[in-house]
């Protein structure tokens, strides 16, 4: 049964808003602790990914009527779950963190490109949303290449990822605040 859609935020849980808050929180932690608490940052990154994956799965289960958006959300939840498991249980060193985070950034960039292209092909898009996707995509390429090539040390890598997370989180918060309905993509 499909719930009635409305223009008010009181009846919907905006997953991009919650994700944005979590990503921004981790970005702030990374900016504050980038020199001293590498293992804490790695573990907290993994745990927060597990939390976000759980929220996304809950959102999908509550809204089985979502079609294309639901498919993308399932993929997103799978990626978040995998990242949560890897960073919580398998990564112990900054070297491994930098390696896996750069691969993750490249993977997310590819998905952003595919999703943006799919939106363009369907004619369902919002120009500011596409511009933000492009900016995120380009900055993600720069961050991913910088990390993967080893151009920065461990502390600087955490700083770079922290800044990227902070900005990406703010973009998600902005997107989450502008959603009019839980059929992701309907924007004011």
Q: What does each model-found stretch correspond to?
A:
Residues 7-21, 64-77, 120-137, 155-157, ...:
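Cytoplasm-facing juxtamembrane segments at the starts of transmembrane helices
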Residues 83-133:
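Membrane-proximal helix-loop-helix units in multi-pass membrane proteins
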Residues 83-93, 137-154:
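Hydrophobic alpha-helical transmembrane segments in multi-pass integral membrane proteins
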Residues 22-29, 48-55, 79-86, 104-115, ...:
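Membrane-embedded alpha-helical transmembrane segments of multi-pass integral membrane proteins
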């Amino acid at each position: 049964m499909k719930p009635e859609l409305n223009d008010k935020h009181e009846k919907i849980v905006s997953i991009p808003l919650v994700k944005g808050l979590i990503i921004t929180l981790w970005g702030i932690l990374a900016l504050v602790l980038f020199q001293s608490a590498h293992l804490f940052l790695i573990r907290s990154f993994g745990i927060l990914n597990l939390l976000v994956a759980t929220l996304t799965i809950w959102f999908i289960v509550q809204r089985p009527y979502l079609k294309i958006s639901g498919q993308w959300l399932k993929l997103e939840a799978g990626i978040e779950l995998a990242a949560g498991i890897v960073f919580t249980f398998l990564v112990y060193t900054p070297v491994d963190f930098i390696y896996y985070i750069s691969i993750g950034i490249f993977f997310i960039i590819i998905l952003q490109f595919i999703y943006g292209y799919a939106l363009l092909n369907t004619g369902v898009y919002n120009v500011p949303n596409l511009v933000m996707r492009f900016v995120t995509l380009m900055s993600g390429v720069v961050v991913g290449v910088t990390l993967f090539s080893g151009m920065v040390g461990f502390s600087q890598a955490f700083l770079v990822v922290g800044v990227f997370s902070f900005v990406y989180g703010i973009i998600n918060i902005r997107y989450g605040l502008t959603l009019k309905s839980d059929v992701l993509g309907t924007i004011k």
